Structure formats: C-alpha cells, structure tokens
From Swiss-Prot:
Keyword hit for Magnesium: yes
The protein's name in its UniProt record: 3-methyl-D-ornithine--L-lysine ligase
Protein role: Is required for the biosynthesis of pyrrolysine. Catalyzes the ATP-dependent ligation between (3R)-3-methyl-D-ornithine and L-lysine, leading to (3R)-3-methyl-D-ornithyl-N6-L-lysine. Is also involved in the synthesis of pyrroline-carboxy-lysine (Pcl), a demethylated form of pyrrolysine that is generated by the pyrrolysine biosynthetic enzymes when the growth media is supplemented with D-ornithine.
Binding, ATP: K18, D39, N57, I58, E80, N81
Cofactor(s) essential for the protein: Mg(2+)
GO cellular component: cytosol
Top enzyme class: ligase
Cofactor binding remark: Binds 2 magnesium ions per subunit.
Catalysis: reaction(s): (3R)-3-methyl-D-ornithine + L-lysine + ATP = (3R)-3-methyl-D-ornithyl-N(6)-L-lysine + ADP + phosphate + H(+)
ATP-grasp domain segment(s): 93-277
Binding-site residues, Mg(2+) 1: E235, E247
Gene name linked to the record: pylC
Residues annotated as binding ADP: K112, K139, S146, E168, E169, Y170, V171, E247
Disulfide linkage: none
C-alpha cells in the first residue's frame, strides 16, 4: 500500500450500487469526480447513474479490485453486506489507494448492543434498556435498517418479538442527525439535520436545523473516543428531557449528505477523502444563508404524490436524473410506481419552499400528479 496517496480525488470506486451508493455518487459528481460503481447484481439500482459500472463479486474476484485500485484515487464501501465489508478489511493492504472506511468503528456501530455498551462507557445519554413499563420501542439488533422498528404499548406483545430484537424505552421527540468525519486525531462535526419519519420509522424527508452545541459536543465525544478515522452518522431523539442518542452508523449515509451539502456547502465525500489525505480541521462556523428540502414522493396509481421512505425506494430498478434547474433537482427511481427524490435549496426556507412548489407543479404538469 502506498504511503502517500496524492492530493486530489479525481476517480472514486464505490462498492455497492444501492441507495448509499447513489448518495456517494451524487456528491462525487458534484466534486467533479468520475464514479466507478462495482456491484455483483447486474441490475444494481444506480448502474446507469455511474460513469462506469462493473458487475462482479469482489470476494470471488479480488484480483480485479486490486487492479482497479491502481487506477482510482479511493475506494468507498457503500453497502451493509458484512461479508463484503470484512473481506475488504482483509485485503485493503493490497490496494494502491485508500479505503475511506473505519472498519473498527463499523464493527461497533453495526452491532446495536456493542454501540449501547460504548455509549455507557463514555456517559452518552441513551434510551433505557428493557424498561419495566410500556411504551417500549423495539428495533433490530444490527445494521441501520428501520425494518421491524415499532412502538409496543402492551407488555404481552414482547413475547411475540423476533429473537434478538432490542427493547428500549420509547422517547418522545424529533429524530435529529449529525455527521462526523475524523482523521483519527481531529474530528469535524458537520451540519445538524431533522429526519422526518413515517409510520414505519423510515425517513421520507430531511431538512437542516440550527446549530445545536449540546448535540455537537455529544457527537464529537462519540467520534473522538473511538477514535474515528472515517465517517459516522449520529442519530438522536431531541425531546423535552434533552438529547438521547439512539444509534451511530460508521458508514457513508444516504439522504442526509445531500441536505448537508446544500445547507452548509460541505461535500462529505471531499471531507472524507481529506481524512485519509493530509487530515481535516474542526468546523467552527457554518453559513446561515442556506436552506434545503430533500424528500421522496411516490406517484400512486390514483395520481397522488405520497411521501415514502427508503424501504420503498430500494425496491426500484433504475435511479437517475429526471429534471434540473437552479435550486431544483429531481431524480426518478423507476419501479412498480415511480418514486421521485426532490431536492430544493435557496438562501432561506422561504426560497426553498417556493422552489418546492415549482418542482411539484412540474410533476403535476407532466403526470397530472397532486401532492
């Protein structure tokens, strides 16, 4: 493995062609990079959005990936396949470019029980485990999926849970998110966002939030105590009793990075590369004259646009550009029902909302859609 990686990121190789991959590819393109996507699925969701798509299983043909590493500036895993992640960790020393990933942090964050132990070890406030009285909040023990997450109001229902499900107190409040990128010594806490969730606890919209010193301090502590060399997403509930961290995910997120980009001007792909090439600086101030609305809407059979989350989006078969003008970008995910990802930005919320209205009118004129 080379000791010096060079100063610029011109070509990035993404391992994974689903929603995480789309987010990373989008921001890479915004930074002027060429995007190569590798996925073992020939019908990978973003195969046509990438500049180049190669279909093969890296665990079966590692020599291909080693050869590719000589012609790209970085490799970024954008999937949650544990076999794939562990395999990349085992062969990363053979690559001629860095892997922009903290494997040890991912091991902790992927396992929600290990995460809770980590939170307790550094005094991070978090929902109580196995409370004596309902309501309870139950969620899967691994990965970042919201599948199976729900509120239980009757103790009897606990007996019907799938084995291994985590049981926590239900905490009222809004779901908030913060990305942190570290180089192992310095940790850049980026931009707070509000995660709008549906009845299945899946995110259908992201909007920016004002600076929150306590959330930034918590997120910094979580990154510094690992210590993080890579990217990590911190999610918390912000309620009447303050912040309670519900999970960390040490992998490149989907949805929030685009909202962060347009509301702060910070490209998380560029910042992540700097963590492996020369180091990063902590972020002290952010611009206040930016706002962004990021959301997913499905065109139902009755012509109505319905908010949906990533669970629906992930069932699509092709994802790419649909419409663009200053302050408006619309992406189309083809499938049983078309799902649009709409991104609107401006100097403030009012300008972003005006552009949202224009974007919705575009869909209405083309599809007869009603929001």
């Amino acid at each position: 493995m080379r000791e010096s990686w060079g100063a610029s990121l011109k070509t990035i190789c993404l391992i994974g062609g689903k929603l995480q991959g789309f987010e990373a590819a989008y921001l890479s393109k915004k930074a002027g990079m060429k995007v190569l996507v590798i996925d073992k699925n020939p019908q990978a969701l973003i195969r046509n959005y990438a500049d180049e798509f190669q279909c093969f299983n890296i665990t079966e043909e590692p020599e291909k990936l080693v050869a590719i590493s000589k012609n790209v500036d970085a490799i970024l895993p954008v999937n949650e396949n544990l076999e794939c992640i562990e395999f990349l960790n085992s062969i990363k020393e053979k690559f001629s470019c860095p892997v922009l990933f903290d494997f040890e942090a991912y091991r902790i964050s992927r396992d929600k029980r290990k995460s809770k132990e980590y939170f307790a070890s550094i005094g991070t406030p978090t929902p109580q485990d196995k409370p004596s009285e309902p309501p309870y909040f139950v969620k899967p023990p691994c990965e970042s999926s919201s599948v199976g997450a729900r509120i239980i109001h009757d103790r009897k229902e606990l007996k019907e849970l799938e084995p291994g499900m985590l049981i926590e107190e239900y905490v009222e409040g809004e779901v908030v998110s913060l990305e942190v990128i570290g180089d192992g010594n310095n940790f850049a806490v980026v931009k707070e966002t509000l995660v709008h969730i549906d009845d299945t606890y899946d995110c259908h919209m992201v909007t920016p939030l004002p600076l929150d010193p306590s959330f930034r301090e918590l997120s910094y502590s979580l990154a510094a105590n690992l210590p993080l060399k890579g990217i990590m997403d911190v999610e918390a509930i912000s309620g009447p009793l303050g912040l309670k961290v519900i999970e960390i995910d040490a992998r490149f997120p989907s949805q929030t990075p685009t909202a962060v980009y347009y509301s702060s001007g910070i490209n998380l792909i560029e910042l992540l590369f700097r963590a492996f090439n020369g180091g990063i600086e902590e972020i002290k101030t952010l611009p206040e004259d930016r706002y962004c609305i990021y959301e997913h809407l499905m065109l139902a059979e009755n012509g109505v646009l319905i908010p949906v989350g990533e669970q629906v989006l992930s069932m699509g078969n092709d994802y790419g550009n649909y419409y663009e003008e200053p302050g408006i970008e619309i992406f189309l995910c083809k499938g049983e029902n078309p799902v649009f990802t709409l991104v609107f930005w401006g100097r403030d919320r009012e300008e972003a909302e005006a552009r949202k209205n224009k974007g919705l009118s575009i869909l209405k004129s083309r599809f007869g859609a009603a929001a």
